[in-house]
From Swiss-Prot:
Family: Belongs to the class-III pyridoxal-phosphate-dependent aminotransferase family.
Protein name as it appears in the record: Diaminobutyrate--2-oxoglutarate aminotransferase
Signal peptide: none
A single MF term (Gene Ontology): pyridoxal phosphate binding
Lineage start: Bacteria, Pseudomonadati, Pseudomonadota, Gammaproteobacteria, Moraxellales
Biological process per Gene Ontology, one example term: biosynthetic process
Keywords on record: Aminotransferase, Pyridoxal phosphate, Transferase
Superkingdom: Bacteria
Pfam families associated with the record: Aminotran_3 (PF00202)
UniProt subunit comment: Homotetramer.
PANTHER family recorded: DIAMINOBUTYRATE--2-OXOGLUTARATE AMINOTRANSFERASE
Length: 445
């Protein structure tokens, strides 16, 4: 049976395929429970289900599809690679295509190939995160890691240990030891109850003092790992001066600074990498999702000083995905040629509703219950019931998006970078309508 011969069954419905999926796949499946559709085809910012209904896609493979679905240049790259005679899988053997992709990607890192080298990892962001921590421990000879509340770094054993959300962690015993969590700045829900500049200043001082205090009780870590914009944690943007202090302190104490750019990277924030908003240079950059142009690929950018690997010190069978390197090269070229970083910045600043935060096309809207008293910094309690109802109402209005953040109360928009002004207007119109419908359903108002 070929791919082209797999057509929807006669008169098949979404329910038909979802029922079959529930019968054949593990209970672990997640997205179909919130977005109950079976996708037949997709193009750009739109997907069409097996019943012929079209949806605006503001999920985009959790940010993987920077150029949207089935971009002509991406499809052409796949066809060209298949026709070229290149092997699809090369371990870490080199090819002309890999050489071109490596050079193009290095050019986007601060200082380029003079400052950084690349390491190709397994196919997922979690694989690259695991490799980054292993490298930091190899380089420093130390064993502990500092991560941050609200952070997300993957679902594997080690990466889950460094992730803030407890729902997945509570079911697993014996995660990687030696992870120390620290508070991450959050203007709307400041962990110190201060908010504003006072909260940022206090957290900046706290981090520096924690590292330098000989009575802190925590030995010097091998690495500090963080996201410049927390995605799954609710689209929380790190303040510039806090990030700059993290860089200053880690550099002073020879602690490896790892920036997880798996979701925020590749122009989504309005710059190629989200850490660029603070003007810093990480020691290790974790890249996946958009780096492969929609196909599985994960890469580390490593400052040459920290490239402590011995030959074959870290390997992985699927680190030589030629199709992904080809499509990744197309994404890099298209981002530059069409100035998609600027497009992300402009579309992200389009007037919107609610409590919006983030950068570029990485946007979060936190849903609260304004009827209940605000806390000491003026933030109302989260309303998870209403947030879930809004997501459902968005789906019913043919708009696909995800929730995240604490208690699942942040509506997240990860639109493809190619989204047009007209499509942004349509997203907002559908979202407004969904919010109004959800309010009636939940509160009768």
């Amino acid at each position: 049976m070929s791919v082209t011969s797999v057509n929807p069954a006669t008169n098949a419905t979404n329910e038909y395929y979802l029922t079959r999926q529930s019968q054949m796949e593990s209970n672990v499946r997640s997205y179909p429970r919130k977005l109950p559709l079976a996708i037949a085809k997709a193009q750009g910012c739109w997907v069409t289900d097996v019943e012929g209904t079209q949806y605006l896609d503001c999920l985009a493979g959790a940010g993987t599809l920077a150029l949207g679905h089935n971009h002509p240049a991406v499809i052409q790259s796949i066809q060209d690679t298949l026709a070229s005679g290149l092997p699809l899988h090369t371990l870490d053997l080199t090819t002309p295509l890999k050489d071109a992709f490596t050079e193009a990607l290095l050019a986007y890192l601060p200082g380029g190939k003079e400052e950084y080298c690349l390491q190709f990892c397994g196919p997922s962001g979690a694989d690259a995160t695991e490799a980054a921590i292993k490298l930091a421990k190899t380089y420093t000879g130390r064993s502990s890691v500092i991560s941050f509340s609200g952070g997300y770094h993957g679902m594997t054993h080690g990466s889950l240990a460094m992730t803030g959300n407890l729902s997945a962690k509570n079911a697993v015993n014996g995660l990687m030891p030696g992870v120390q969590f620290m508070p991450y700045p959050h203007e709307y829900r400041c962990p110190l109850g201060l908010g504003g500049e006072a909260g940022v200043d206090a957290l900046t001082y706290y981090f520096e003092n924690f590292i330098e205090d000989v009575e802190s009780g925590v030995t010097k870590p091998a690495a500090v790992i963080l996201e410049a914009i927390q995605g799954e944690g609710g689209v929380v943007t790190a303040p510039v001066k806090w990030l700059q202090k993290i860089r200053e302190v880690t550099e002073k104490h020879n602690i490896v600074l790892i920036l997880d750019e798996v979701q925020a990277g590749f122009a989504r924030s309005g710059k190629m990498f989200a850490f660029e908003h603070a003007g810093i240079e990480p020691d290790v950059v974790v890249m996946s999702k958009a780096v492969g142009g929609g196909l599985p690929l994960a890469v580390l950018g490593i400052k040459r000083k920290f490239d402590a690997w011995q030959p074959a010190g870290h390997t992985g069978t699927f680190r030589g995905n030629q199709l992904a390197m080809g499509t990744g090269l197309v994404v890099l070229e298209t981002i530059k040629e069409q100035n998609l970083a600027q497009n992300a910045q402009e579309r992200g600043e389009f007037p919107c509703i609610g409590n919006v935060r983030g950068r570029g096309l990485m946007i979060g809207v936190e849903i609260v219950d304004e009827r209940k008293p605000a806390d000491r910094i003026g933030s109302h309690p989260a309303d998870s019931q209403l947030a879930a109802a809004i997501q459902t109402a968005c789906f019913n209005n043919n708009l696909l998006l995800e929730k995240g953040g604490r208690n699942g109360t942040v509506i997240r928009l990860l639109c493809p970078l190619i989204i047009t002004q007209e499509e942004c207007v349509e997203v907002i119109a559908r979202f407004k309508k969904a919010v109004a419908e959800a309010l009636v359903a939940v509160r009768g108002a």
